[in-house]
Amino acid sequence: MSETTLPDYLTVATELQSASLAVNPAEMHGLLTGMLSGGLNLADKSWQPLIFDYTNEGMGWPDRALTLAEATLKVTTSEITGSGMELSMLLPDEDASASLFDLADGVSDWINHFISGLGLVGAQLNKASDGTKEALADLEEMAKLGIDEDDDMEEQAQLLEHVIEHVKACALTIHAEFGARPSEDAAPTIH
């Protein structure tokens, strides 16, 4: 069985930019992951009007950009609802010639849009458990973090990796409380 992975950051960035969409790949993925973690219905395309409204003034996305978003959503759904407790993040990387500053900005963009995604699907965060409220508070704080150019870059890179792992843990915690689970008979019946 081959492992499905997120689309390439640079490919997604190029497509979103050429479609003149007001979102970068990290923001798109954070938004989709937040929507999933907030209880997005897994069986329909209810996410599309939400993302169209949020990123493109209600207008649909061009087919290629929408296909990349669907592929991203499919991989993320598989990861976040699976038993592996894994979550990949679509962030700037070496292939996109990203600096440590770009990566930190991407993490912040991802977190802010994750939180927006929770709101778009109407997650009842005020009724969340203490653990979930703590995870959300941690995310809000991590979204404010930045890289200090006067500090040791290698140390900052290691710290950022720890932050990324904590972001993933927080997102999984929130999904565990609010996210939809695929049903056993998720495949539609064909008559």
From Swiss-Prot:
Domain of life: Bacteria
One GO CC term on file: cytosol
InterPro entries: YgfB-like, YgfB-like_sf
Record family assignment: Belongs to the UPF0149 family.
Protein's name in the database: UPF0149 protein VS_2635
Originating species: Vibrio atlanticus (strain LGP32)
